[in-house]
Amino acid sequence: MRINPTTSDPEVSIREKKNLGRIAQIIGPVLDVAFPPGKMPNIYNALVVKGRDTLGQEINVTCEVQQLLGNNRVRAVAMSATEGLKRGMDVVDMGNPLSVPVGGATLGRIFNVLGEPVDNLGPVDTRTTSPIHKSAPAFIELDTKLSIFETGIKVVDLLAPYRRGGKIGLFGGAGVGKTVLIMELINNIAKAHGGVSVFGGVGERTREGNDLYMEMKESGVINEQNLAESKVALVYGQMNEPPGARMRVGLTALTMAEYFRDVNEQDVLLFIDNIFRFVQAGSEVSALLGRMPSAVGYQPTLSTEMGTLQERITSTKKGSITSIQAVYVPADDLTDPAPATTFAHLDATTVLSRGLAAKGIYPAVDPLDSTSTMLQPRIVGEEHYETAQQVKQTLQRYKELQDIIAILGLDELSEEDRLTVARARKIERFLSQPFFVAEVFTGSPGKYVGLAETIRGFKLILSGEFDSLPEQAFYLVGNIDEATAKATNLEMESKLKK
């Protein structure tokens, strides 16, 4: 982290005059720049091209040095469109990697890859900036303690708990509730952990980014009246951006998150949507730079690029960055090098199911497909582990019996199986939960359920204590006491109707 010198500083103007190059070649988003002998910029240095195009329009393009070619030439990748650039234009070596604004001033705002605000809400305080290229924290700084990151969402905390400072893969198609789940997590970390969130939109649709921003304003995650009270900073590099921007926007978001962790000593949630697009952009840049492609046409440096990003996402003794990454699986092929490389870094997976969404069970997290390396008795304790295993066994048995029920009906099942089905249906409904950010749509107030309450509730259902209660009582409630209260209300309503 550094405090920016002003542009009027004589030291800056001398450096800018000193390190001046000229464009020698332009191939799409890739520029070759010639510098005077002995004035070559370093790899990853930012280069800025300023001037006017043939129509007299101002041009301001930032590039990043990727290769030193020899003969005093460098090859750089542009972070924005290169239309209007001409050979012979002046290029200034900034002498540093790209630096972006960090700190409280970023909350409630939308930035591009260069850290420039793109939400028409005026300039951002850029006195405190940080370079996007950094080393991962040293081993001695890491917090190696295994601890659960409580989200307040029952299905996640019980069956696929998140690790504090871990990485979680979020799998789900369109319309199954990814955005709502992301917003609820942003809301809960702010309330329960006093933390903030950073959302990195990497190579996804501009419309989705806009929808997310509007929904965040509607649900109060972004406070329009007082931006400083917002809980999230947004960084977008969407589908229409050049590959250089899409490849680096993840690092911009990560840099903002690192400041909250290292300087403000907070717990941070970092969302990356979509991690596959980060790999895809790297593949495009690799081809443009003339590297020999590897398996399935991906860049030969795929594992290194992924590792460089993922290793910076971790817990230190000061704070933590817990990352939730949406993973697009091309053609549903989990062996494709992009998702396969991502899986190596994940501690947990949260799989959203269209079947559950169709039943109206939200969050539509699939309890059998979602996994976590944290679900071990030595980490979560015997009680939590046993309860989670029993819940999974009950749901698995219900899944196996569904074909028989569809053909022959419930009456043909044994007494034991009928009891299992009844409990499984209660569990399925109890895994649903009203969200704070969905209050606008559901009309029922959101609920944050602590881990101890979650375990107690499921243990009571499994023990058969609530076999007499209707399954409807367990739908969209918080803890188990609310379910019993709802059952009493339902009973009174049915008596009144009679």
Swiss-Prot record:
Biological processes, Gene Ontology terms: proton motive force-driven mitochondrial ATP synthesis
Residue positions binding ATP: G172, G173, A174, G175, V176, G177, K178, T179
Cellular component terms per the entry's GO annotation: chloroplast thylakoid membrane; mitochondrion; proton-transporting ATP synthase complex
Phosphoserine PTM sites in chain numbering: S13
EC number(s) given by UniProt: 7.1.2.2
Record's catalysed reaction(s): ATP + H2O + 4 H(+)(in) = ADP + phosphate + 5 H(+)(out)
Signal peptide positions on this chain: none
Pfam families: ATP-synt_ab, ATP-synt_ab_N, ATP-synt_VA_C
InterPro entries: AAA+_ATPase, ATP-synt_VA_C, ATP_synth_F1_bsu, ATPase_a/bsu_AS, ATPase_alpha/beta_chains, ATPase_F1/V1/A1_a/bsu_N, ATPase_F1/V1/A1_a/bsu_N_sf, ATPase_F1/V1/A1_a/bsu_nucl-bd
Enzyme class per UniProt: translocase
GO MF term list: ATP binding; ATP hydrolysis activity; proton-transporting ATP synthase activity, rotational mechanism
Record's subcellular location: Plastid, Chloroplast thylakoid membrane
Mode of membrane association: Peripheral membrane protein
Keyword terms of this UniProt record: ATP synthesis, ATP-binding, CF(1), Chloroplast, Hydrogen ion transport, Ion transport, Membrane, Nucleotide-binding, Phosphoprotein, Plastid, Thylakoid, Translocase, Transport
Top-level lineage group: Eukaryota
Positions bearing Phosphothreonine: T6
Function: Produces ATP from ADP in the presence of a proton gradient across the membrane. The catalytic sites are hosted primarily by the beta subunits.
Assembly information from the UniProt record: F-type ATPases have 2 components, CF(1) - the catalytic core - and CF(0) - the membrane proton channel. CF(1) has five subunits: alpha(3), beta(3), gamma(1), delta(1), epsilon(1). CF(0) has four main subunits: a(1), b(1), b'(1) and c(9-12).
Family as reported in the entry's similarity comment: Belongs to the ATPase alpha/beta chains family.
Protein name: ATP synthase subunit beta, chloroplastic
Source taxonomy: Eukaryota, Viridiplantae, Streptophyta, Embryophyta, Tracheophyta
